[in-house]
């Protein structure tokens, strides 16, 4: 049709990005919008007044596109949701297990039965929306602004001399490019191997991971990172180790926020590129968090999750949990925390929080 008011809106985007809350009547009232700008007076009346989960059909494939793609016009089109939320389903999320999609940044998701969340409002996260991940459960989202990007930043920093090879009179341009690419491609792997051999001590180099601000807990994108405990003996592997630990401390701050707000975290589920590619980082994550992290088999959890929702919307499964059980690929690796290292990391995490508080206080 051509009536925008008939378009079915997904609760995932509406709840996490448009302030939709059914228990408060849906979208914010008109007074809210007009208080932001008089031009927004009446804006609310042009928006939607209902939402749907990703397990429900939005309608059927338009005849034009059906003919163009050689498909049936009876193909059901499902309601949309955010990539990582579908990825959490593709990664077989379970109640009270923190599902972490780890790539350039992280998206951390947790689900809990709606009946167990009554009266609980989690401060400082990125949204708490009924049905945004699994229908019938409360979907909660958090995340880090930089995760893989933090490691990429460090690689770029160390690679600066390599960028100057093109000006060398000793090698030709093609050799310079090949050499630069080879070293750059191996750098994170080599740094990880060396960092894994380093002893762990309370006085080691310490990094705050806010290289792209802080998303959770308590979003503040203007905050910046910091490094302490540097000395003349600090080498590239030691500093890389600090950056990795900093990102894992940032991850622990998210888990602790849920726990402090009365939401248990029973374990971790690792998804995404970093989870699949870096055993060193995942072991540090397990040690810092002091809980196991299961790595899902599939490298395309978002696509698998979308397929699970599509199968549910099409009626192949009664509920998305059934699709998860039938279509899920399971886990291929479990990283278990080392008790001795976890005890040291508990002390270093306290130092991380102290340094972070100082940095944030200095900014304020």
Model-identified regions with their sequence ranges:
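Gly/Ser/Thr-rich active-site cleft segment
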Residues: 1-81, 208-212, 240, 244
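Glycine/Thr-rich phosphate-binding loops that ligate phosphate moieties of nucleotide
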Residues: 18, 25-26, 52-60, 78-79, ...
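Flexible, glycine/threonine-enriched loop-and-boundary segments that flank and lead into catalytic domains
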Residues: 82-88, 264
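Short beta-strand-to-turn element immediately C-terminal to the catalytic PLP-Schiff-base lysine
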Residues: 1, 91-92, 108-112
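Short glycine-aspartate micro-motif
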Residues: 74-81, 90, 97-101, 107, ...
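Generic recognition of flexible, low-complexity loop/linker segments
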Residues: 65, 74-77, 87-89, 95-97, ...
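Short helix-loop-beta connector
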Residues: 72, 94-95, 263-266
